[in-house]
Amino acid sequence: MKQAILYVGHGSRVKKAQQEAAAFLEGCKAHISVPVQEISFLELQEPTIETGFEACVKQGATHIAVVPLLLLTAAHAKHDIPEEIVRVASRYPSVRISYGKPIGIDEEVVKAVYHRMKDIGVPYENARVVLIGRGSSDPDVKRDVTGIANLLQEMVPVKEVIPCFLTACGPNYKEVFSELEKDDGITTFIVPYLLFTGMLMNEIEREVQKLKAHNPNVYLSSYIGFHPHVKNAFLNRVRETAANSEGQFDFDGGSYASAAH
């Protein structure tokens, strides 16, 4: 058996985000002792999943571990990536495939959130944290972001952690911001739970500037991005998918739900 890893990033229109994702994935390769490792993206960016998968096969891979670089569990992880794998893999029926989980709820990413807060240089004890996720109609997204918020509350001595979302589920972050316009004297950290920069981050920056006109005790952190703790969490996902010790990551050509995720 010849093992391969196929990393699957989301892809972006923004050049800086493209470069950050590609550099991050290239940097992961040195930490994984697998002979064949290829990078791909779901959309908006080359190489495609098809190109990456075929590159693995051409190098003799008989088992490909497909690992999505996604913070949250939603449609991309459950449907879009699996559907593309099914389409491409149908040409290579002898290749065994395992399929990994998104990062999800993980102490390592909670540490990344904490460090983004700490980087601001303002005392965080008894502060309020507003954690902004992308949002989705998929309930697992709300579950993931809420779970991360709860873990942060347990691990860091803050007053409260409020999970909210940019779109598609509630509470919407603008609703939370409107409640923060009245300065109650509590330091508030706004933490964008996003992997890369782009239109969503720009939108948050604009809204925080408006909020600060009413409440100067509001501080915006950097987006989570590819922090070393995010890297740790992702590498754990890569290793468990490649090992697939109990077959729990087997991909049988069905939907995401067909695997024991």
From Swiss-Prot:
Pathway: Porphyrin-containing compound metabolism; siroheme biosynthesis; siroheme from sirohydrochlorin: step 1/1
Biological processes, Gene Ontology terms: siroheme biosynthetic process
Keyword Nucleus: no
Induction text: Up-regulated by sulfur starvation and repressed by cysteine. Also induced by O-acetyl-L-serine (OAS), a direct precursor of cysteine, maybe via inactivation of a putative transcriptional repressor of the cysH operon whose activity is controlled by the intracellular levels of OAS.
Keywords carried by this UniProt record: Iron, Lyase, Metal-binding, Porphyrin biosynthesis
Reactions mediated catalytically: siroheme + 2 H(+) = sirohydrochlorin + Fe(2+)
Record InterPro entries: CbiX-like, Sirohydro_Cobaltochel/CbiX
Molecular function, one GO term: sirohydrochlorin ferrochelatase activity
Enzyme class: lyase
Amino-acid positions noted as binding Fe cation in the UniProt annotation, renumbered to this chain: H10, H76
EC number: 4.99.1.4
Entry keyword Lyase: yes
Role: Chelates iron to the siroheme precursor.
Family: Belongs to the CbiX family. SirB subfamily.
Protein name per its UniProtKB record: Sirohydrochlorin ferrochelatase
Organism from which the protein derives: Bacillus subtilis (strain 168)
